[in-house]
Amino acid sequence: MRDTILFGDCRETLKEFDEKARMCVTSPPYYGLRDYGGEDSQIGMEQTPEEYIDEMVKVFRLVRDCLTDDGTLWLNIGDSYYNYRKDGCIPKQTFSNSRQDLPITTPRRSNKLQGYKDKDLIGIPWMLAFALRSDGWYLRQDIIWHKPNPMPESVRDRCTKSHEYIFLLSKNKNYYYDNEAIKEPAKDWGTRDRTNGKYHNEGTGLQPHSGLTKSYPTKNKRSVWSVTKKPYKGAHFATFPPELIEPCVKAGSQEGDIILDPFMGSGTTATVAKSLNRDYIGCELHEEYGTLIQKRIRDYVPLNKVSQEPSINILDII
C-alpha cells in the first residue's frame, strides 16, 4: 500500500489503511476560506467553527489509529476572521482557469453565529489544538511559520497577518523525534583558547569571554521557522512549501518509513517524502489531482540536493 493515494472522503478512506505510518504531516482545508468543490463531503464549509473542529477531531482520531505507537502528527493550520456576509459569497478554487476564484453563493456562510462578533478572530488553530488534546493527543509544541512574503491585506485597523501555526502532537508520551536531523548552525559559537584560559569568537564580532565549558557549531532548531511561500503553477489553490515540511519529515521519521497525509492536495507531502527516501500514503477528495501529484513527484528537486556530477581533482589535471 506504500506510495498510494486513496481518492475519496478521508473519513472513509483512512479506514482502508493496512499499514502503520511513522508520522503524519498535513495542512487541512482552513475554515470558511475557500470552496474546493466536493459539495457536502468537503471539510471547511461547515456552518460553525465548532462543527469544523468536530469534523477535524474525527479525522485525526482515524489518523491516530494509522500511526505507529511512537508516531507524531505535524499539523499546519491557519486562522479565520468572522465576517457576516449577507450574500454568502466565498472564492471558488479549482483546476479550471475559467472557474478559478469565481465567487459562488453559499447560504452556509451567511448565517449569523452566536458568540462571534463581526471582525472577530475566531482562533481556529488553538480551538483545534485543545480539542485534539482533549481527544487524547499529546500537545507537544506550537511552531510559528513566519512568512517573509505574506499575502497583502487592505486592512487599516490591524497588522497584516504573516504567520501560521504548525502543531506537533504525539500519539503517546514517548515518541520518535530525531533532534540531530534538524539542528541549525550556531552563529556565535566559540573555541577554547588554552593560552589564556578564555574562549575566543573569531569572525563573530564578540569579545573573548570565560566561563564556558563547551561550545558547539550547531544548536537545537528554534520554534519560529521563516519559510517563503512559493506558488505552484500547476495548481490554482494554496500549497504549503516543501521547505516547510522537510524538517517535520526529517525529525519525525527515518528512511524507509511511511509518511501519511489525509489531505494530500497538490502532493507536497508525497514529493518531500520521496526526496528524503521515505514512502507516502495519502488521501485526496478530488481524483483529478492524481496526475498533478505524480508530476510534482517526478519534477521535484530539493533545494539542498547536492549535484551528482563527478568531482575533479586538480592534481589529476596537472
Per-region residue spans from a language model:
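Flexible, disordered linker segments and immediate boundary regions flanking tandem C2H2 zinc-finger modules
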Residues: 304-309
